[in-house]
Amino acid sequence: MMLYIVFILSVIFVIGFVGFSSKPSPIYGGLGLIVSGGVGCGIVLNFGGSFLGLMVFLIYLGGMMVVFGYTTAMATEQYPEIWLLNKAVLGAFITALLMEFFMVYYVLKDKEVEIVFEFNGLGDWVIYDTGDSGFFSEEAMGIAALYSYGTWLVIVTGWSLFIGVVVIMEITRGN
């Protein structure tokens, strides 16, 4: 049952990003991105990352809703265009969905999924418990590893978010 839930959430995740990439109006692009982010948090929660899923949901989606609410208010249209009105956008949306479904069928037709990534060199990330001496929370150790070993990742992520907000502000201010 859990496999089906993750599969359905993954399909909704991809459909949301296909909808985001073939948006006819900025309102629907933001909606597709927010839906995909929420479904992605659900996938993380399903795999046991309750803290990470909650933080992404609160911080990322909260920030996304503020940014997209502001940009939508700046670039609003009286009658926003939908997918059905523009035949080129509808064709791109349906083509992308068909390509995604054929890719899933091609991968799953043998009912075997091979390991795509091999995790070598996890010695720094493994939590060592000496038995009866105590309990280590995996989420707390993951956060500690993110800020100790992933310092540059946090810096690059913060800088990317800042540049994204600056670009969005420049685009909306130009109209």
Swiss-Prot record:
Record's keyword terms, sorted: Electron transport, Membrane, Mitochondrion, Mitochondrion inner membrane, NAD, Respiratory chain, Translocase, Transmembrane, Transmembrane helix, Transport, Ubiquinone
Catalyzed reactions: a ubiquinone + NADH + 5 H(+)(in) = a ubiquinol + NAD(+) + 4 H(+)(out)
Keyword Transmembrane helix: yes
An annotated GO cellular component: mitochondrial inner membrane
Class of enzymatic activity (EC top level): translocase
EC number: 7.1.1.2
Keyword Iron: no
A biological process term (GO) from this entry: mitochondrial respiratory chain complex I assembly
Transmembrane portions of the chain: 1-21, 25-45, 47-67, 88-108, 149-169
Membrane topology according to the record: Multi-pass membrane protein
Stored Pfam families: Oxidored_q3
Localization: Mitochondrion inner membrane
GO molecular function, one term: NADH dehydrogenase (ubiquinone) activity
Superkingdom, taxonomy of origin: Eukaryota
Complexes and interactors: Core subunit of respiratory chain NADH dehydrogenase (Complex I) which is composed of 45 different subunits.
Similarity comment: family membership: Belongs to the complex I subunit 6 family.
Function description: Core subunit of the mitochondrial membrane respiratory chain NADH dehydrogenase (Complex I) which catalyzes electron transfer from NADH through the respiratory chain, using ubiquinone as an electron acceptor. Essential for the catalytic activity and assembly of complex I.
Entry protein name: NADH-ubiquinone oxidoreductase chain 6
Species for this entry: Bos mutus grunniens
Organism lineage string: Eukaryota, Metazoa, Chordata, Craniata, Vertebrata
